Amino acid sequence: MNATHETRATDLDARAVLAALADRWDAADGHGYGELFTPDATYVQFNGVLLSGRREIAEMHDLMFRTMLYGTRLVTGEIESVRRLGEDHAVVVSTGAALYPWQKEATPKRLSRQTLLLERRDGRWLVAGFQNARIKPFPTSGPLFEVASRAVRLRVDRARRAA
């Protein structure tokens, strides 16, 4: 298999995994969602909480689908990159959002970026690692940026003098 064909195949595999995650999410099937992960997977939620293993991932999503994420659907955005790490591993970076029924599309405030480590086991691609983070561009200009930058420099300089 040549590199271009391999990349396309992995891209299709990544799309299939993301579609399966969305299907289980939309069905509010926490345990089915968990089955898409390896038994020893790690999952970092957008708020930084670490879930370890398929069982914990499934149980947390089951709880969330019955409470805070009740009635939501998972909208997968674009796949920004797919990078193969050998025959049976790939790193996928994509965007997406969980939307409530009254939301028609993902607003910038709700949009997240995910990094997934996919692992092929017994011919099936599963998620071995998942990191989810809200997309919040870091300001690099403007009056608030200038004030915050000066405040940081003052505090750092003060701490260095005190040390």
Predicted regions, residues:
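A structural signal for short hydrophobic beta-strand segments in well-ordered beta-sheet cores
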Residues: 82, 116-118
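Short, solvent-exposed loop/turn segments at secondary-structure boundaries
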Residues: 47-48, 103-107
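Beta-strand elements of well-folded, non-transmembrane domains
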Residues: 26, 98-102, 118, 135
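Low-complexity, intrinsically disordered terminal/linker segments enriched in charged
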Residues: 120-121, 127-163
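Hydrophobic pocket/interface hotspot
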Residues: 21, 33-34, 41, 53, ...
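Short, low-complexity N-terminal intrinsically disordered segments enriched in polar/charged residues
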Residues: 1-39, 145-163
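Surface-exposed, charged secondary-structure patches
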Residues: 13, 42, 58-104, 156-162
